[in-house]
Design a protein with these regions (language model features):
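Alpha-helical/coil-rich non-catalytic "connector" segments in signaling and regulatory proteins
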Residues: 1-171, 178, 182-189
Length: 189
């Protein structure tokens, strides 16, 4: 799954700075959301990265502290603040303190960075992680359950996902113990 700490690996986020919420860097990011005003509760489901840009900043009732409280109460993942002359110019200490208290990551990035690049890269990263997770569970579930696997299909899927199937691999063995007798279970019966 894509997490807040992974944001800093994206090329579009190369100039982003983590400001607060270091203990929340493992928060999952399911999607991104860019509100137009302070009334966005019904538009989020949790685990979104909140992108604070011009529409919400210029809204008549904009209040960064209230926005942060709302994001935390809605179980959002973190917050990306666009900063600069026409965006957020200062970030008060009470904002950073509150985010730290709630392990809520806050990042800042210049408002001059095209948002389309950030949205696109995050979307691709989330989709790739989801696809890889499904692929991993499918391949390994079939192996563990002893289901027949087409070797050519298996090799192709591993190559698509960057697995080096020619290198030494690790195998695990399960030893099943019957709870009633504390003896190893006989798998033939």
């Amino acid at each position: 799954m894509f997490r807040c700490k992974d944001l800093l690996l994206l090329p579009s986020m190369a100039k982003a700075r983590p400001l607060a919420g270091k203990e929340g860097m493992n928060n999952l990011i399911r999607w991104v959301y860019k509100p137009e005003d302070m009334n966005f509760s019904k538009w989020v489901h949790g685990n979104e990265l909140l992108i604070v840009s011009l529409p919400v900043i210029k809204s008549p009732h904009f209040n960064l502290y209230r926005l942060l409280e709302k994001a935390i109460s809605l179980h959002m993942s973190g917050m990306l603040l666009l900063v600069g002359e026409h965006y957020i110019s200062t970030i008060p200490d009470n904002i950073l303190s509150y985010a730290n208290q709630h392990d809520f990551p806050i990042f800042s990035i210049s408002g001059d960075i095209p948002l389309i690049d950030i949205f696109e890269e995050i979307g691709h990263a989330i989709a790739y992680d989801d696809q890889r997770e499904r692929m991993d569970s499918g391949i390994f579930a079939n192996i563990i359950l002893g289901n027949p696997i087409n070797p050519d299909h298996f090799i192709r899927r591993c190559q698509e996902q960057g697995y080096d199937i020619l290198s030494l691999q690790q195998v695990f063995i399960l030893k099943l113990v019957c709870p009633a007798s504390s003896q190893t279970c006989d798998c033939d019966h």
